[in-house]
């Protein structure tokens, strides 16, 4: 009798372990979050800092910025919901770029895009390169 109870117990565990538990966030709604407000740009050397006010949304997950790094590359930067700044880095020139900033919630819904224009200053590598001088060392 004990053997039948034990076998039934083991069989129950085997059946229960065959199902895969759901991992991840389920889609909770189809309502997009509000757009960011008061977007301001601080242009830095080879980069830019965008500050903003977060929208009031309970399931806001992150803020995403999309911009064209050069002719061939479209880049994205993301910032956590726990900060109000987004940094765009790695810009090798001083050309103006349009950045599209959207808020994304846990369901993947995106807000209306807010367009900001950044004008990065001269990158540090170009400033240092201009000041370098190459001279022979030993001869």
Kindly label every feature range from the protein language model.
Residues 2-10:
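Sec-dependent signal peptide recognition
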Residues 86-114:
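Beta-strand-rich modules
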Residues 14-17:
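C-terminal motif of bacterial Sec signal peptides marking the signal peptidase cleavage site
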Residues 38-39, 75-78, 87-89:
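Beta-strand-rich interaction surfaces with strong enrichment in secreted/lumenal proteins
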Residues 43, 79-81, 90-94, 133:
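Surface-exposed coil/turn segments at beta-strand junctions on protein surfaces, enriched
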Residues 54-78, 82:
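Extracellular low-complexity, O-glycosylation-prone stalks/linkers
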Residues 19-59, 112-139:
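Pro/Thr/Ser/Gly-rich low-complexity, intrinsically disordered linker/stalk tracts
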């Amino acid at each position: 009798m004990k053997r039948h109870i034990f076998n039934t117990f083991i069989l129950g565990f085997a059946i229960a372990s065959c199902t895969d538990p759901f991992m991840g966030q389920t889609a909770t709604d189809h309502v997009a979050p509000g757009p960011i407000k008061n977007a301001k740009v601080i242009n830095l050397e080879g980069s830019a800092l965008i500050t903003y006010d977060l929208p009031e949304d309970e399931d806001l997950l992150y803020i995403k910025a999309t911009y064209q790094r050069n002719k061939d590359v479209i880049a994205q930067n993301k910032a956590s919901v726990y900060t109000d700044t987004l940094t765009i880095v790695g810009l090798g020139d001083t050309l103006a770029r349009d950045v599209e900033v959207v808020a994304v919630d846990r369901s993947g819904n995106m807000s209306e895009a807010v367009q900001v224009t950044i004008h990065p200053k001269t990158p540090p590598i170009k400033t240092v390169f201009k000041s370098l001088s190459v001279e022979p060392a030993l001869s």
